[in-house]
C-alpha cells in the first residue's frame, strides 16, 4: 500500500502543479475538437481538465505494472474533459439539439461510432482517423443534470482500445480490432 502511494503521489503532485502551468493539449493536434460551450445558456462549469503530452509521458513512465496502460498513455497527445452542471432554467431540449448539431457538424474525417438517445438525453462517440490509426476520440453527452465533453488525442490503434479493458464484451472487442480506418 505504501509502495503504491509512493508511486502515485509524484504523479498526483505533477498533475496539480502542471495544470496551473498551462501544460495542456494543443489545439493544433489533428484529433482536437473545439467545443463551443460558450453558446449554451444555463450552464455552470463543474470540471475542466486538460492534460498535454508532457504530463501523459510522465504518467506513462510511472506505470510499471500494466504494459497496456503504459503503451496507451505513451500514444496519447492530450486529454480534455469539460463537465457542466445544467441549471433548472436551462432549455434542455435546446441543449440536446445543440449537442446533436455539434456532433453532426464535425468535419467528414470524424465518424460517429455510437449514438444513444433517450427521452431528454443524448450521447455521441466519434473518432477521427487516418488510414493507419485513430487520431482522436470525442464524446459529447447531455442529460437533465450535466453536459459533458471529452476529447482524447493521439495515434491509437483499434488493438490498443481492444486491449484497454477486459470489461469489453468479446463481440465488441472483435469489432474494435477489425474496425476499418480507411
Residue ranges and their predicted role:
Residues 1-10:
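Bacterial N-terminal signal peptides that target proteins for export
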Residues 17-20:
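C-terminal motif of bacterial Sec signal peptides marking the signal peptidase cleavage site
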Residues 22-25:
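Bacterial signal peptide processing site
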Residues 29-99:
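Early exported N-terminus immediately downstream of N-terminal targeting peptides
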Residues 44-46, 74-78, 108, 118-122, ...:
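Extracytoplasmic
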Residues 103-129, 175-181:
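Short Gly/Thr-rich strand-loop-strand
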Residues 126-161:
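A short, solvent-exposed beta-edge/loop patch
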Residues 154-182:
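C-terminal partner/receptor-binding element of secreted or periplasmic proteins
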Amino acid at each position: 500500500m505504501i509502495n503504491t502511494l509512493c508511486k502515485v503521489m509524484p504523479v498526483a503532485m505533477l498533475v496539480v502543479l502542471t495544470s496551473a502551468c498551462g501544460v495542456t493539449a494543443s489545439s493544433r493536434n489533428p484529433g482536437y475538437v473545439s467545443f463551443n460551450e460558450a453558446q449554451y445558456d444555463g450552464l455552470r462549469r463543474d470540471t475542466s481538465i486538460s492534460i498535454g503530452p508532457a504530463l501523459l509521458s510522465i504518467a506513462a513512465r510511472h506505470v510499471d505494472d500494466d504494459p497496456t496502460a503504459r503503451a496507451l498513455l505513451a500514444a496519447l497527445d492530450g486529454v480534455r474533459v469539460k463537465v457542466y452542471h445544467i441549471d433548472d432554467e436551462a432549455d434542455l431540449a435546446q441543449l440536446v439539439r445543440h449537442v446533436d448539431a455539434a456532433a453532426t457538424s464535425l468535419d467528414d474525417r470524424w465518424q460517429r461510432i455510437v449514438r444513444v438517445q433517450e427521452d431528454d438525453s443524448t450521447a455521441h462517440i466519434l473518432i477521427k482517423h487516418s488510414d493507419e490509426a485513430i487520431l482522436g476520440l470525442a464524446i459529447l453527452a447531455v442529460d437533465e443534470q450535466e453536459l459533458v465533453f471529452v476529447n482524447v488525442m493521439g495515434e491509437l490503434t483499434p488493438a490498443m482500445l481492444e486491449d484497454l479493458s477486459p470489461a469489453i464484451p468479446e463481440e465488441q472487442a472483435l469489432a474494435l480490432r477489425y474496425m476499418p480506418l480507411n
